[in-house]
Amino acid sequence: AFPEELPRDVISQIFASAADVVREAGGTIAGGHTIRNPEPIFGLAVQGVVNPNNIFRKSGALAGDIALLSKPLGTGVVTAAGTDAEKRTAIAGMRTLNRRAAESLQEVHEAVHAVTDVTGYGLAGHGWEIADRSGVSLVIDTANLPLYDGALRLAQSGHRTGGDARNRLYVEGRITISADDALVALCFDPQTSGGLLAAVAPDSVRDLVSSGLWTRVGEFVDATPGIVLR
């Protein structure tokens, strides 16, 4: 949906850029519908066929699995209050697909027990979803978190997004915190185009981390389902 006064070349650039990303992801745009609207609205619906044996689910993490994250944290706070340079770095990360990370998991498919993407609920919220569905607890080592430029500085200065408070409520009563306040805040920071969070058997972790696509951020332990930030 686009306003009538929006130049046609701008609309063409939006469609062309979307097509480029879809091709990069291995897809094809087929059809569409455009209407007039005072504000621009653009989105895609994805359809596909998948081998049911190759689906990664939120459930299935085992005690002893290592938690790996494929992108830095901090898009929420950086895009809200970061410098122009910091925003550019975060946007570049947001524009990067998770395809390579997902393909690397397929290479060790049997060792991957659960996967989700880190988006609006932040690392803590989406980590809780895996822990809850798997019947284990997720311990996050906040000192190991990969962060976008400026994210820690902004969090230390007290910058928070509106999603921070909502995400804390989402895991209220299910979380134990003993970490630095700023790093805790980044675990609750809502992400746009965040990375994948994977529960992986220890024997396969070294190769994934050495690929440069993944960072070890914690482990799943045999305990009442919950989240520990330490």
Where are these regions (language model features)?
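Glycine-rich phosphate/pyrophosphate-binding loop regions near the starts of catalytic domains
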Residues: 1-88
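Short hydrophobic/aromatic-rich motifs at helix boundaries and adjacent loops
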Residues: 72-76, 96-100, 123-124
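Glycine-/charge-enriched secondary-structure boundary and capping motifs
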Residues: 5-28, 35-42, 53, 107-112, ...
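Phosphate-binding glycine-rich loops and adjacent basic patches that engage nucleotide phosphates
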Residues: 59-69, 84-92, 112-116, 166-174
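Generic alpha-helical secondary structure signal
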Residues: 9, 84-88, 92, 99, ...
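Active-site glycine-rich loop that binds ribose-phosphate moieties when present
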Residues: 45-55, 86-108, 181
